[in-house]
């Protein structure tokens, strides 16, 4: 790897962000788009609010 300028913030390092924006698509290409897409789409991990399940009526 190339040395990174220590004066740059971590989020401004070259290659730290993909050139295209993230989408809501779940195809294989979009699931491996970036690290965030992989964690949320491919692994299904989200730390947001959980939706309440409705109980089945008998």
Swiss-Prot record:
On modification after translation, the UniProt record reads: Acetylation by EP300, CREBBP, GCN5L2/GCN5 and PCAF regulates the transactivation activity of Tat. EP300-mediated acetylation of Lys-50 promotes dissociation of Tat from the TAR RNA through the competitive binding to PCAF's bromodomain. In addition, the non-acetylated Tat's N-terminus can also interact with PCAF. PCAF-mediated acetylation of Lys-28 enhances Tat's binding to CCNT1. Lys-50 is deacetylated by SIRT1.
Residue numbers spanned by region Core: 38-48
Whether Acetylation counts among this entry's keywords is yes
Enumerate the residues marked as the site Essential for Tat's translocation through the endosomal membrane.
11
Record bears the keyword RNA-binding:
yes
Residue segments, region Interaction with the host capping enzyme RNGTT? 49-58
**Which positions carry N6-acetyllysine?**
28, 50-51
Q: What is this protein called?
A: Protein Tat
Its source organism is Human immunodeficiency virus type 1 group M subtype B (isolate BH5)
